[in-house]
């Protein structure tokens, strides 16, 4: 059984990334996000263990860090799904991301509670 250190939250945010191999910006979007990494969807190919620079727009901030591709799945629709592990998230970015993810989880829990009543 797989154990995750950080909770994943399903959210969609724009992503720009540059790979170490091909350093031109490519566009993707998050499928889910955690303090440890992100699952992204892209039209451009990625390779397992590839290093990259990631920018994720979470208004009003942009989270920037280095990352490593942990896995790659090719979907039937031609899109690529990839798991990215964050490698050098700065403390201010980590704190912003933590607060954002907590807020999203709190809002969803509240919405779930209200929909049951």
Feature map (PLM): residue ranges:
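Short, well-ordered loop/turn sites that connect or cap secondary structure elements
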Residues: 46-48
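Solvent-exposed residues in well-ordered beta-strands and their adjoining turns
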Residues: 18, 41-43, 57-59, 70, ...
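Hydrophobic core residues within well-ordered beta-strands of beta-rich domains
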Residues: 11, 26, 52, 63-65, ...
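Conserved hydrophobic positions within beta-strands
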Residues: 30, 67-69
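Short, solvent-exposed secondary-structure boundary/capping segments
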Residues: 38-42, 75-86
């Amino acid at each position: 059984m797989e154990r995750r250190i950080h909770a994943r939250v399903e959210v969609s945010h724009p992503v720009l990334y540059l790979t170490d191999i091909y350093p031109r910006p490519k566009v993707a979007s998050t499928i889910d996000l955690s303090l440890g990494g992100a699952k992204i969807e892209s039209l451009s190919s990625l390779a397992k263990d590839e290093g990259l620079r990631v920018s994720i727009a979470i208004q009003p901030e942009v989270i920037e860090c280095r990352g490593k591709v942990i896995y790659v799945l090719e979907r039937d629709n031609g899109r690529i799904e990839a798991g990215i592990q964050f490698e050098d998230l700065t403390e201010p970015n980590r704190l912003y991301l933590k607060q954002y993810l907590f807020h999203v989880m709190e809002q969803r829990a509240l919405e779930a509670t209200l929909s049951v009543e």
